[in-house]
Amino acid sequence: MTKPFRIANAPCSWGVLEFDLEGEAAGYAQVLDEIAATGYSGTELGDWGFMPTDPPALRAELDRRGLALLAAFVPVALADRAAHAAGEAVALRTARLLRDTAGQGCFIVLADNNGSVPQRTQNAGRVTAEMGLSDAGWEVFAEGANRIARAVRAQTGLRTVFHHHCAGYVETPAEVARLMALTDPEVLGLVLDTGHIMFGGGDPLALLRAHQERIWHVHFKDFDPAVAAQARAESWDYFGAIRHGIFCELGRGAVDFPAVRDALTGMGYDGWIVVEQDVLPSLGAPKESAQRNRDYLRGIGL
């Protein structure tokens, strides 16, 4: 019998995002309470300082609610070589917290500094090749990703996964493929994010087929093509698309989650599935959405 997937959620579903945005997100105690209350068994860390940064204190908060700690998102401006050293330091600090709280099974979720390049942010979901990195730019980007992943592995034993993400330099299937070709498969894997790859013009199943050996971590996020079409027509930037609900509740968009479930099962994936429904701070009803998302997954056998 196939081992059932473990299902987690993340603070970003409560508006705890890496961007400097207006609005007040919920505090960590409320977020953890509501993740547990809505039927999830794990969480990602959220921004540094959102949850306690003392390992025993963080472990106590998680244990009190029966939650596992899985990963932490670390954005770095990888296209800028001058940012690599500071990015490595942040990744190592974060990796040590993960390791000392929850052991060696956690991941650093490395990403571009999404939302920081105006052209990519303004054209999220509709970027053209001309908006991408040059060959030299790709070498710098991959150099930074390899450097950080190798340092994390060598100094903490943790593995790193790269998160393709709209409003960054790795958004489209071609950009994902380019990064994977340029990076070390021994230390850097890939997050499959079902919503971001669709927003970026791709297909989750095709991404799974293309990069099966590199997919070590999975984010379940739905995608509303009607909002994407409106974003194109009205030239919304990435944050405008988020505000209008581009990442809708699971089962209400275009992602074929039963097919993704079957593909993950077929490839022998044994990691976590993390539900993420990115919302802006103070918007939406996160607990109710989390419950509906969990109910949807139960309805498809997850």
Q: Model-flagged regions — what are they?
A:
Residues 18-25, 138, 173, 198-269, ...:
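Gly/Pro-rich active-site loop or hairpin
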Residues 42-57, 77-89, 166-172, 194-202, ...:
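Acidic-and-aromatic substrate-binding clefts and catalytic sites of carbohydrate-active enzymes
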Residues 1-20, 75, 116-128, 235-244:
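N-terminal small/glycine-rich loop or linker at the start of catalytic domains
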